[in-house]
UniProtKB/Swiss-Prot annotation:
Family matches, as Pfam families: Ribosomal_L10
Keyword Oxidoreductase assigned: no
Function in brief: Forms part of the ribosomal stalk, playing a central role in the interaction of the ribosome with GTP-bound translation factors.
Protein's UniProt name: Large ribosomal subunit protein uL10
Length: 194
């Protein structure tokens, strides 16, 4: 590569580092062009998969302020630059590596920190953002229903207590009226006898 081409390539890779939320560094030795195309499709629109020269990638990472990745830039290197949620792209890379032993995940970075292979795999094992949000919403909905039940419980208990007291008074009032009627009838009967 001529010097101007190298400068342009470094600038492009630097922009990819700066514009991505995460990156996963891989070794692609033994993958065919068809395999790489399949991997790019699996990554989707939120990630790009680029093959690059190690010296240029090292320089671009340094210019982007990313440290701790130099040891990963050995051998045939390709980088998945992730612009959206890193979980889906990491999951796609991990699944592709299971099916294609030629793809080796070396590590990566996220939020400015270097990631080991184990950390990339842990990210891949997480559930997607949408699923986690759905679970959170479900948990919140259940808790809100419980809270509403707790807030409504004292009011319904008071209503049941008031209804029970009213029934009790009605029953006592009916019992109190019956002896009074009997008492008023007794003198009338007494007059009739006399």
């Amino acid at each position: 590569m001529a010097k101007p081409e190298k400068v342009s390539a470094v600038a492009e890779i630097t922009e990819q580092f700066k514009g991505s939320t995460a990156a996963v560094v891989t070794e692609y030795r033994g993958l065919s062009v068809g395999n790489i195309t399949t991997l790019r499709r699996a990554l989707g629109e939120g990630a790009t998969y680029s093959v690059a020269k190690n010296t240029l990638v090292k320089r671009a990472a340094a210019e982007a302020g990313i440290e701790g990745l130099d040891d990963l830039f050995v051998g045939p290197t390709a980088i998945a630059f992730i612009k959206g949620e890193p979980v889906d792209a990491a999951k796609a890379l991990k699944n592709f590596a299971k099916d294609n032993k030629a793809l080796i995940i070396k590590g990566g970075y996220m939020d400015g920190a270097a990631l080991s292979v184990e950390e990339v795999n842990k990210i891949a094992d997480l559930e997607s953002r949408e699923i986690l949000l759905a679970k959170l919403a479900g948990a919140m909905k259940g808790n809100l229903a419980k809270a509403a039940g707790l807030f409504n419980a004292p009011a319904s208990q008071m209503a049941r207590l008031a209804a029970a007291l009213q029934e009790k008074k009605a029953a006592e009032g009916g019992a109190a009226e019956a002896p009074a009627e009997a008492a008023t009838e007794a003198p009338a009967e007494a007059e009739a006898e006399s």
